[in-house]
Amino acid sequence: MIAVTIIDWLFVLALLLPVLYLFLFAAFSMPRSKDVYPPARKQRRTVTLIPAYKADAVIIRTAQAALAQEYPAELHRVVVIADQLKPETLGELRKLPLTVIEVTFENSSKAKALTAAVDRLGPDAAEIVTILDADNLVDGSFAVRINEVFDAGIVAVQAHRTAKNRDSDTAVLDAASEEINNSIFRRGHVALGLSSALILSLIHISEPTRL
């Protein structure tokens, strides 16, 4: 009987710990204090890396949004890491004021694409490195605001990603899941002094060697 009771309590504890974990961070994510950073004293050199694996349908729009920044063009470089893009897509990209790095791998991955780009660009390519997915869209003030954050002494940032489309039940569910994850695993973590969980896109770091 005692052995059964201990097993029961261990089972309850195993179920309770994840619930308490989620509840704790969800509770601390509720206060919505808005971080406001002062204007940056220095404009840093930035590079935006966009790994694009067979992303012909979305990469042009993403690249255009990444370029359309309220930030000095000479300090803001956009690099598309093209993995198996169509020739016509590559042609359209090369018409834009950005760098195209073509890569080919037996087994493609974002990590391999980013490593190849960093090796090609070198460690002194920029002071701020931004990683976007091929379908991430950013607004025109994005680079300015990220520079303000780094000017405050922060060396790594996970930006807030939101769903683009909410025109179907599945899209709404995906958007809700994104916001729940952002609240619990990012806002909640930061509120308790922990690092934000990473989502491998919209990440900003202070130099390429940190990749």
Task: Locate each region found by the language model.
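Short, acidic, metal-binding catalytic loop of nucleotide-sugar glycosyltransferases
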Residues: 64-75
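Acidic helix N-cap motif at the loop->helix transition within catalytic regions
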Residues: 60, 86-94, 141
